[in-house]
Regions:
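Short basic helix-loop element that most often maps to the first helix and adjoining turn
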Residues: 12-31, 56
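Conserved hydrophobic/aromatic packing and binding residues within compact polymer-binding modules
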Residues: 14, 28-29, 39-42, 68
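Recognition helix of helix-turn-helix/homeodomain-like DNA-binding domains
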Residues: 33-47
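Short, charged recognition helix plus adjacent turn
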Residues: 4-5, 67-73
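A detector for short, charged/polar N-terminal pre-domain segments
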Residues: 1-9
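DNA major-groove recognition helix of helix-turn-helix/homeodomain DNA-binding modules
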Residues: 52-67
Length: 73
């Protein structure tokens, strides 16, 4: 699996969990102190998050980090 595919799968997982939590991109961006465009870029697989930010995201969304990092083929 290449980097582009992983980023897209990660972004899809973020979007799924965000929607389950009934959060808009704007709300999540505000919670994480980032722009809505950054959240949109993550969900589209165009932004690469650091491990620290991924941990933060999991905490803010109250989800197991493994759900965000589940990369099925």
């Amino acid at each position: 699996m290449n980097k582009e595919t992983l980023l897209k799968k990660f972004g899809k997982n973020v979007k799924i969990e965000r929607i389950k939590k009934d959060l808009t991109q704007e709300q999540l961006a505000e919670i994480m102190n980032v722009s809505q465009n950054y959240i949109a870029s993550i969900e589209c697989g165009k932004a690469n998050m650091s491990l620290g930010k991924i941990l933060e995201l999991a905490e803010y969304m109250d989800v197991d980090i493994n759900l965000l990092l589940a990369f099925e083929k």
